[in-house]
Amino acid sequence: MTLVDVRTPDPKRFIPGATGDWEVIVGMEVHAQVLSNSKLFSGASTEFGKPQNSNVSLVDAAMPGMLPVINEECVKQAVRTGLGLKAQINKRSLFDRKNYFYPDLPQGYQISQFKDPIVGEGKIVISLGPDRQGQFEDIEIGIERLHLEQDAGKSMHDQHATMSYVDLNRSGVALMEIVSKPDMRSSDEAKAYMTKLRSIVRYLGTCDGNMDEGSMRADVNVSVRRPGEAFGTRCEIKNVNSIRFIGQAIEYEARRQIGILEDGGTIEQETRLFDPNKGETRSMRSKEDAHDYRYFPDPDLLPLEFDDAFVTALAADLPELPDDKKERFVRELGLSVYDASVLVSEKAIADYFEAVAAGRDGKTAANWVINDLLGALNRTGKDIEQTPVSPAQLGAIIDLIKAGTISGKIAKDLFEIVLTEGGDPAEIVESRGMKQVTDTGAIEKAVDEIIAANPDQVEKVKAKPTMAAWFVGQVMKATGGKANPQAVQALVKAKLGIEE
């Protein structure tokens, strides 16, 4: 890959060193497991969590005479992902053998794509912010390529005191290796890139993005340089499996390299591992180059070819992606860019919000989903798929507010009841006597009693009309929060002679 610097140095992202400023350069190779029922070149299952070596075919185990057969669904998933990345789709690509010896690689080589990948250049737009002025910064990160390849098996070294075991369940599972250009200039940009990429493949349904299960992991390439100078020597941090760890690994590695260079040393090109317990990287091996793998075309596989109609059919069936959905939420529902960004960050959240917002005010629905629902889920460590409050229940609460049946304060209490106990919101309001008081006579009686009991406050209001809010609060307290706030405010102002 030819390295091209497309970014203008930005002082906001410089790292101060003992001898001046430095700039970190980051590129990523993300391995995303293809969502498919069977492996890339065999019919073995890809189901996660099965007993060791139970998802293994003769092809996966590299038994003599077994030939690979391409899985068409994996090809379609790769093309869908390429389209989602606004990338060039190569209608002719080749599979190559990447030769290296490792115990969990039965063939002695990995079937991958070297010179002719299935997907060419594309892009992802990430958004950083908001800043203190509430503004967002959009940054375009280039995609160099996407290619299909087999995953390796798994070596297990903690099962026996003197032996290592090999589990081939993962061997032969289809991976999409998505290679970015070296366009990122901070750990925040790298985390935003990984978050956005995971969101895109989840929307597309081409990868589940579950990093804790290993179905999405990143090799992070890090180098440093003086601003405006040529790229430095990079180190690759292998198999980082969380977005938080990606940020920590980049920050540590950048500081490590800066320290070496400022002491007069040189950076060795190498592969490193990130230790999340210590928050640091450590050397794994010297970094290999392409010639070390002795790539050559796989003689068992014909070139992969398809026509325009194949690509057009897949493009026509693509779902609405995060950027398009965010733009629609802002344009049609009047949401702020920030709120829309939160709601589209996960497909499940966007789907939930749209179900709540259907036929209702979009801003109101967004406030309840973001502030109340997501806030409650964050406090309990749950995600949107685990929510005890259905879209229908939250929508019913919003409807009760709009109808004047309950006040906003009562609605908060009602939400907590539904969250912890469940039930139909309307029935809960009825059975627990939570309806707000709209009877003007009853509200007026409460207002008169509060005014009569607080003559000193009445005098203060005459001098400072904004003090009327104190009376509103006292009336709401006296009625257990059930009085209609607008009616209370109007009566208080009328009784105290405050003009609107």
Curated annotation (Swiss-Prot):
GO molecular function: asparaginyl-tRNA synthase (glutamine-hydrolyzing) activity; ATP binding; glutaminyl-tRNA synthase (glutamine-hydrolyzing) activity
HAMAP family: GatB
Quaternary structure (record): Heterotrimer of A, B and C subunits.
Transmembrane annotation, as ranges: none
Protein name: Aspartyl/glutamyl-tRNA(Asn/Gln) amidotransferase subunit B
Function according to Swiss-Prot or TrEMBL: Allows the formation of correctly charged Asn-tRNA(Asn) or Gln-tRNA(Gln) through the transamidation of misacylated Asp-tRNA(Asn) or Glu-tRNA(Gln) in organisms which lack either or both of asparaginyl-tRNA or glutaminyl-tRNA synthetases. The reaction takes place in the presence of glutamine and ATP through an activated phospho-Asp-tRNA(Asn) or phospho-Glu-tRNA(Gln).
EC identifiers of the protein: 6.3.5.-
